Amino acid sequence: MEVNPPKQEHLLALKVMRLTKPTLFTNIPVTCEEKDLPGDLFNQLMRDDPSTVNGAEILMLGEMLTLPQNFGNIFLGETFSSYISVHNDSNQVVKDILVKADLQTSSQRLNLSASNAAVAELKPDCCIDDVIHHEVKEIGTHILVCAVSYTTQSGEKMYFRKFFKFQVLKPLDVKTKFYNAESDLSSVTDEVFLEAQIQNITTSPMFMEKVSLEPSIMYNVAELNSVNQAGECVTTFGSRAYLQPMDTRQYLYCLKPKKEFAEKAGIIKGVTVIGKLDIVWKTNLGERGRLQTSQLQRMAPGYGDVRLSLEAIPDTVNLEEPFHITCKITNCSERTMDLVLEMCNTNSIHWCGISGRQLGKLHPSSSLCLALTLLSSVQGLQSVSGLRLTDTFLKRTYEYDDIAQVCVVSSAIKVES
């Protein structure tokens, strides 16, 4: 008959405690009217309570701090801090003590120990203390593995370890939307607007210290989250410094291509990586958290092989009087084009000039400007349409309708105004 040997007692004891900020002590005030049976008894008890504030005893919030009563929640972007203590509970001197702390995540194992050198000896009732820090960068299950090895006086080598399992939660819900800007000429530009919606999905308020956009190398960014009032920048969020649980805040940014890249149409056309958001917040007693998103990507606007944009156009024109517009034609392809311009009249818009004229060769990423004249025979808001560009090399025609809109008024109305 086999008998399992008794479990061997270790000479050292391992204790692990998470280090977090304390919280303000709260109490539940119990009061009554003076004419009630207890009289002033409850009020006197609150005045004698050391946890209450003098002169404001009925407030739940006190001046004293309390240590955390449980492990609490750990959120992505926060710093996980833990106190590790190895105590010699025996009456023997222990030698060659090595304490190792590893953090096991779903993808990697990290060594958090400040030193990997062994301690020569540890006398009775003495301890080895260590504090570890780690910025949490993954969500999901984490396991803190603390291993202790040592040698007894008899030369026997001992080893034991403990596991501490905890979950890392997501603190923020970040949603982004991209908008390709349109100029006042009703044409798509190279500017990109980014709207970031940030929601606090924790159970405590957050102070949003910084929400910035780090653009990619091809863009400059301008934050649109403040307004200028009397020479002073004021945030658009007003006096709301805190983001309450489940509340959402929207941030807006404008990205413009740098000059050296804006002049190269083919480069900007294929750019999908915009940049990444850097979010910094503070919670209980200034406990800091930081979160960086991955590289934000957008769908690149489809300009086709030839891009037509308007450089100048009047807002209001007179009925049956010529007006001028300036067009910019850009070759977004990787080949040279030989272009022919055709102008087709519509029911309300009539082009002035020669249709079918040669524009010449246009090299890749190159542009040319055209001054065109037209008139409208119908009042009201009219759409400028009817431009056709034909590449004689490939016999391919590009049609451009609804390029812009103009308001057409009669001459009499303009004279009277």
Swiss-Prot record:
It comes from the Eukaryota. InterPro entries: TRAPPC13, TRAPPC13_C, TRAPPC13_M, TRAPPC13_N. Pfam families: TRAPPC13_C, TRAPPC13_M, TRAPPC13_N. One of its GO terms (cellular component) is TRAPPIII protein complex. Part of the multisubunit TRAPP (transport protein particle) complex. Belongs to the TRAPPC13 family. This is Trafficking protein particle complex subunit 13. The lineage of its organism: Eukaryota, Metazoa, Chordata, Craniata, Vertebrata.
